[in-house]
Amino acid sequence: MESRRAAKSLAFVAMIPLPRGRDKAQSRERSLGVIGGLEPLASADFLLKLVEASHADSAADSFDIVFEQRAHTRGTEPAGDAARQLVLFDVIASFAERGVDRVVLPCFSSQAFLDQLQANSPLPVADLLAALRAHVRRQFPAARRIGVVTSGHLRARGVFERNFPHGEFQILYPRWDGDYSLELLREACVDLAEQGAELIIPGLSELTPFAQKLGPVSVPVIDPHRVYAQYVVSERLPPPERPFKLGVVGGVGPAATVDFLHKVVRHTPAHRDQDHLKVLVEQNPQIPDRTEHLIGKGADPTLALYATCKKLQAGAADLIAIPCNTAHAFIELIQPHLDIPIINMLTVTASHVRELFPALPSVGLLATTGTLSSGIYRHALQKQGLREIVPPPPLQASMMNAIYGPQGIKAGFTSGQCAEDIQVVIEDLVKQGVEVIILGCTELPLLFPEREITTRGGRRVTLVDPTDILARRCVSQAMARSTR
């Protein structure tokens, strides 16, 4: 029965007519992407039963069917599974590009890795074994001993045991393993009946077309293709569950992006790799300098920032973080054109300062001249009842040199003259009565990773790192989404 030749590549689109009894104006057309298995005859059998199920269900919608069968040979397991997964993923991706709503996979071999497909698929995949389990519970509520004729590979993987849970069902197999002809399939069913099976599932795609041609068998033999077709037609599949994905506008600047990602990892309560956040980074250091534009000397970065955010949105990000203080001067214009939120680092920083220091009247700010001139921090702090205190112009010039100069932070320096210049600025702010200072340029925490420092005069001052607060907030939002 088993074909050793690869099925030829085949793709076509067919329109299933509206089911009887439905008014076309009341029907919502849906699109199904059917992926043929390793056996062309089995694929044809399923398509026929899908059409029959659609016509038999008067409550069903009409369907467009996109069918594709790619050339693929059986490989040695598990290498064969891995190769098959890649083929199926490519087909599903092509279905998504064509506007298909959900994927139909009438192939038992693929059920061994269906969880991986569902976890990575952009489309919901109708579960063949879930359809069979629901059918058994509904049509055979008293059945507990389920006979299954399937491949040795699926037996070894425990595919049916996973889907028919122990305690509710007992899975029985024939007392031999190998290829099945129609006659051997009949003998296998007899053997299962003798073992006490109360019903039988042919669990090989190439056997399914012959399930109803076995002749008299003492226990019911399910037709998986018919059951699956009825399930696909009648059941509404929810969109695939996917983990929260954080989108990061990177490259503004590059070192600050790496520092931010490190903080996201550090603040994630993870016990293994899989507990961490999915993160999509669009590293675009070619975005024009934000400060140069704000002080009237450079190109407008709005479009580049927007285009980068749109790429993150297209990549299915749920939330966007921009680890650049000055870039937030452009968020107000960009956000209305996006379908996903940008978390405002300045707003969450101002809120954090107020929560930590309820009676604090003012806060110092170290930032680029562009950030200061835009007033974005001043407005965020005012909403929290905080007054912004900034360096005087000569020291602000030293501040800019420490960031942008030839020995500045953006040039890769994290010690030496740049650190000394910023230390002088901090000393001046402390003399103005400042007790808390916001490191309002994302490169500054690279120089001052501590939460507190002591001035030369012995005064303690708290340093607030906006990227650390942003990372914590991103993680907390991700955790909140995952527990819904």
Predicted regions and their residues:
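Short terminal hydrophobic/aromatic SLiMs and anchors at protein ends
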Residues: M1-E2, I16
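Non-catalytic structural scaffold of enzyme domains
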Residues: L10-R484
